[in-house]
Amino acid sequence: MQQPIVGVGHSMGGCQIATLSVTSRRIFSTMILLDPAIGPPEMGLATLGLGQLTLRRRTQWLTREDAEKALRTSFSTWDPQVLDLLIKHSIHSDKQSVEMEDGPVSLVTGRYQELVNYIKPSFIRSGKVVGQELVHQTGPVDMYHMLGLVTCSTLYLCGGESTLSTPRARELWLSRTAELSYSKDPGEMRKVDERIVPDTGHFLPMEEPKECADIIADWIDKDECMIWNCHIGKQGNIWRDLSNTNRKMNAEVWIEYLQSKL
């Protein structure tokens, strides 16, 4: 894929983007992680109670109007346009009422799809549906241990009132990310920084989408694009503009240089 490529992810998506940046080394030129679900074992999924919250969450209503009212109450802090999109795409009519103008509706994403983000569905392999030990997903903790292997500049964009990106969590992210200089080229710059959106929680991109977008655009435009255009992109263009003959000549000169150094 042609660079530059920017990775952007929120919550579990932030964890997945960060994981991809390590497992597919140097795929991103930079990444922006919004309140990512990344933390040490004491901050892992087993400690957050997300499974209990999911089981308590209502997923069905008698009418679409009831569902809309419930969602607007639960997500009252969200930007109105974002909330309208949530309501439009997150509920659907139950199969038996498709032909009716109104009737029972359900969430498009059911409890199972959400629960498997937090708890491993071990019954799929064992066939034993009940009685098994609960095993939480380890992705956020795994990624925490891999932060040192991140190979690109990283911006952490956090909600000022978020219970996930606490000052302690942000301190760990900033100190560990890209600390090992893994696969770093000579002269390559890797910035790691944070931005805080005041008066927002974990759902900051839904609560303040414009402010988040402005911060992301500023990071990409003023920082990362400048670095890319001045250094990495320029170097790549020099190589692409060479003929095959000149590329071979450069390779031979490089080999001779190595013989004098090794």
Swiss-Prot record:
An example molecular function term from Gene Ontology annotations: hydrolase activity
Main location: other
CC terms in the record's Gene Ontology section: peroxisome
EC number(s) from the headed UniProt entry: 3.1.1.-
Pathway where this protein functions: Mycotoxin biosynthesis
Function: Abhydrolase domain-containing protein; part of the gene clusters that mediate the biosynthesis of the host-selective toxins (HSTs) ACT-toxins responsible for brown spot of tangerine disease by the tangerine pathotype which affects tangerines and mandarins. ACT-toxins consist of three moieties, 9,10-epoxy-8-hydroxy-9-methyl-decatrienoic acid (EDA), valine and a polyketide. ACT-toxin I is toxic to both citrus and pear; toxin II the 5''-deoxy derivative of ACT-toxin I, is highly toxic to pear and slightly toxic to citrus.
Family according to the record: Belongs to the AB hydrolase superfamily. AKT2 hydrolase family.
Protein known as: Abhydrolase domain-containing protein ACTT2-1
Organism encoding this protein: Alternaria alternata (Alternaria rot fungus)
